[in-house]
A protein has these predicted regions:
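Short inter-helical turns and helix N-cap capping residues of alpha-solenoid HEAT/ARM repeat scaffolds
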Residues: 169-170, 185, 200-204, 216-217, ...
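Long, acidic/serine-threonine-rich intrinsically disordered regions with weak helical/coil propensity
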Residues: 2-168, 296-526
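Surface-exposed, low-hydrophobicity interaction/linker segments
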Residues: 166-170, 174, 179-184, 190
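Alpha-solenoid HEAT/Armadillo-like helical repeat scaffolds in large eukaryotic proteins
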Residues: 164-166, 180, 192-200, 211, ...
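Long alpha-helical HEAT/HEAT-like repeat alpha-solenoid scaffolds in very large eukaryotic proteins
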Residues: 229-326
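A short structural micro-motif
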Residues: 214-218, 245-246
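Conserved hydrophobic register position within alpha-solenoid helical repeats
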Residues: 177, 208-209, 238-243
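Core register positions within helices of long alpha-helical scaffolds
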Residues: 106-109, 180, 211, 242, ...
Length: 526
């Protein structure tokens, strides 16, 4: 094709016309190709011109025959979502990073209803594919892969890693491949690692030891024990993090012996009946053996003179809970709170409980800290520190039990406690608990000025929008609370309630959009 023929290529003006739209585009210049278009409808005629000019344009670029091969059809992976839901998603996508949580919620609803975005949204989704939440992959991943192939691009990474060869690539790639290998066959993965481990560089050895967390079992203990003597500090740290997860390991038994040497319960019978218990604390000394197991004071403990107390806390945090089997958890925790070494002992035991999530220890932690804050534990004062311990202990409980206990606090109108515990707890609340919490908010906001000031202080209310049940009733309750807020109320509480109401209304609107009877969408703000 010579220069004159290239100049007559009508692809660019036809593409410009398509961008303008059939009704606004100027009439097409007369050519041999436009003469072939027989469609009367302007839109159909423009599409026909695009097809003809596109084929002519590609032919002029001297591409191979495969460039003109028809694309695969878009698969049918499920019905399109209702129009209102599609409109909502487009609005959320245009809002940027601030709407990320709502985009994730939209895709969760789409997955729950078995629907997907319509074809007209695929381009907008493709532009943001790198930042879409994980929930989007299951819903629209296949569609976006199809669009990528249609545009001559590579489909996105699916997150799955080929475990067939973990010996090549960057540190991150090899760690990911080895983790996949471990997930598939833990024993074979470790057996493959052991002969070559010492030959690898330190950063890779560290990464591979971290990867052993997948499928970790007692069979890994000899290898991890050997890693405690590795020349690289990162490898030793990685092994020190994993070994406490193996309660029957030599590491765990060493920690158990140290814990029993540091803590003991002395029991004496009283003359008039009953038994008194006293916690005897023997602070550990620094030693090379402790350092090998990852127990050494940090910089602040050395400067503040709390070296041995820090060692005690670290030992208890790593010890298996069976080291304290001679007495019930409740007794250990109560004595810890009453001890002059309450901070390292309680927090060490708490860390061990949090690591294992042992149900008996978790409930005992929640029970004793509650009693301590209510003044029912002799020798323990009611302080904000104890309240914080209570809130952290409640967070160890299963979601349903956490909600039941906090609901009891709500009924008892313990405002300061409820505000403290709401900073933790489940990521999402049940419908029943959400209703109870909103009723409590309504009650407190109708109370005294001091109550409303207390409610506004910790900025807890502002974060409830993502956690409360996203139903119409929740949104209506939040709006009613905001509407009844006294006019003279400060900006802090009003700002939080406004944000709470806005988030709940949007979340409720997203759910409504997926109902079959919904036919119009509105804006992303509901």
């Amino acid at each position: 094709m010579d220069a004159t023929e290239r100049a007559s290529d009508g692809w660019e003006p036809t593409l410009a016309a398509a961008l303008l739209g059939a009704e606004r585009a100027p009439p097409a210049a007369s050519s041999a190709l436009t003469a072939l278009v027989a469609e009367a409808d302007p839109g159909a005629a423009l599409l026909a011109r695009l097809a003809a000019e596109g084929a002519h344009h590609l032919a002029g670029q001297e591409l191979g025959p495969e460039a003109l091969a028809p694309l695969e059809e878009r698969g049918r992976f499920g019905p399109d979502c209702p129009p209102a839901a599609a409109t909502r998603l487009y609005a959320l996508l245009t809002e940027g990073h601030g709407a990320r949580n709502r985009v994730e919620e939209w895709f969760e609803r789409a997955a729950a209803t078995g629907t997907r975005p319509p074809a007209w949204l695929l381009q907008a989704l493709m532009l943001q594919r790198g930042t879409l939440p994980a929930a989007a992959q299951a819903v629209v991943g296949a569609d976006l892969d199809w669009l990528a192939r249609a545009c001559g691009e590579s489909p996105a990474e699916t997150g799955t890693v080929d475990a067939s060869d973990w010996t090549e690539g960057t540190v991150a790639e090899r760690r990911a491949a080895f983790t996949a290998f471990r997930a598939r066959d833990p024993e074979a993965a470790r057996a493959a690692l052991e002969p070559v481990f010492r030959k690898e560089k330190a950063d890779l050895r560290e990464a591979l030891v971290h990867a052993l967390a997948a499928g970790l079992s007692a069979a890994d203990e000899p290898f991890l024990e050997a890693c405690l003597d590795d020349r690289a500090n990162g490898v030793r740290l990685a092994a020190q993090r994993l070994l406490p997860e193996l309660p029957g390991s030599r590491y765990a038994e060493r920690m158990a012996a140290r814990a029993r040497a540091a803590l003991a319960v002395e029991s004496k019978r009283r003359l008039l009946g009953g038994t008194t218990h006293t916690l005897v604390v023997t602070l550990p000394e620094e030693s090379p053996d402790l350092v090998r197991d990852g127990v050494e004071p940090n910089h602040w403990e050395r400067r503040g003179g709390g070296t041995r107390a820090g060692l005690l806390r670290a030992i208890l945090a790593r010890a298996p809970l069976h080291a304290f089997a001679d007495h019930p958890p409740r007794l250990w925790i109560e004595l810890a709170l009453r001890s002059e070494w309450a901070d390292p002992v309680f927090h060490g035991l708490f860390s061990a409980t949090k690591r294992t999530l042992d149900p008996d220890w978790s409930r005992a932690m929640a029970d004793i800290t509650a009693e301590a804050y209510e003044g029912k534990v002799t020798g323990v004062r009611r302080t904000n520190e104890v309240l914080g311990m209570w809130a952290e202990a409640l967070d160890l409980l299963p979601d349903a039990e956490w909600e039941a206990r906090v609901a009891a606090l709500i009924r008892a109108r313990k405002i300061e406690v409820v505000l403290a515990v709401l900073g933790q707890g489940p990521e999402h609340f049940s419908e029943g608990f959400s209703a109870a919490l909103l009723d409590w908010l309504a009650l407190v906001t109708r109370g005294s000025d001091s109550l409303r000031r207390d409610l506004a202080k910790p900025w807890v209310i502002a974060r409830l929008g993502d956690r409360l049940w996203p139903g119409d009733d929740s949104a209506a309750s939040a709006a009613a609370i905001l509407a009844r807020l006294p006019e003279g109320e400060g900006d802090r509480l009003r700002t939080q309630l406004t944000g709470l109401t806005s988030v709940l209304e949007l979340r409720a609107a997203i759910r409504r959009d997926f109902r079959p009877e919904t036919t119009t969408g509105g804006t992303a703000q509901g």
